[in-house]
Amino acid sequence: FIQQITGVLEYERCYLNTQHQKDLVINQAKKTFNDDTITKLNDILVPQHLGVDEKDIVDEINETPEKIIVFNHRPDTYKHFKEFVAVCDELYEMRQDFKVWVPLLPNPTRKYMVTTKGNKEWYYKELQKCYVGFSPKQSYGGWSVSTTDGMMNGVPYIMYDDTYYHELNEMGDFFEDDYTALQLLNTYLDDPEYRNEEASKALDWMRNKLVYKDKMLEMLFYMDRLVIETRAVKDTDRFKEIVEWIKTAGKLSKKDIIERLGWGRGIKWTPYRRALMNHPNIFDVNGSTPYYYYKY
């Protein structure tokens, strides 16, 4: 961990999927690094939400869905699946007017469960039939693609009350414990009008906040600004030496050049790369190992 953070401190920016993941890194780093370093790390680490493809967002919600509660996450311990089943068991003792769809479970373990499966197109169509989704507590706080899959298909989700779900839809309904989760499920099942209002709000949130293209444009604008602000090195003796090495060898990788220069982590490569890209006789080829070539 310490070695990885030392490397990250050389970055201009490092992206994570959620604020929760950033908080985990910062809290762990505080055990080793001083306050100034933590402040620098905090500026470098930036949550970058994954988003969804705009064309996958449905035009409108299904206002007459079947009474199906969907748990489209992995049915594993780190997703608190047993706790979810315990809530559903209690709900089933109170009422039997619902089903629970767990598409990633091999076979049903309760009479109220269904585990039907299909391809991606079929999966999206089945989600559109669902009444409400359930997003459980997570051990690692990653981005929940399962939740966005449902919301972009018009399904409202009740979510565990933590930052990694507030980022998905801060206007949604959240539960802190099993009792609250049970009450929310009853509310949705009893009140179709309320369910449809929450489904519409979730769909609007997806359109306005979580479109992948918009998130990538944010990243692109930042990178463009960073490149503009990063000046290329001038025509120094050291730069001329690098050009001569590439000319003599025909091609050299960044690693080859840095090893010849004897540089450590503290020297930034980007200004030299910009200068090489501005040179009329040098071009780069990206691959598993990027190379700089000299052309005559």
Model-derived features: positions:
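Conserved donor-binding/catalytic core segment of Leloir-type glycosyltransferases
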Residues: E60-K79, V85-D89
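Short hydrophobic beta-strand element within catalytic cores of glycosyltransferases
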Residues: M152, P156-M159
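A charged, aromatic-enriched C-terminal amphipathic alpha-helix characteristic of glycosyltransferases
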Residues: P192-D224, I228-R231
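Short alpha-helical segment that forms part of, or immediately flanks, the ligand-binding pocket
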Residues: Y124, V145-M152, Y165-H166
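Acidic anion/phosphate-binding donor-loop and adjacent secondary structure
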Residues: D43-E66
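A short, active-site helix/loop in glycosyltransferases that binds the activated sugar's phosphate group
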Residues: I5-I44, V52-E54
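Acidic donor-binding loop of glycosyltransferase active sites
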Residues: K125-G142, V155
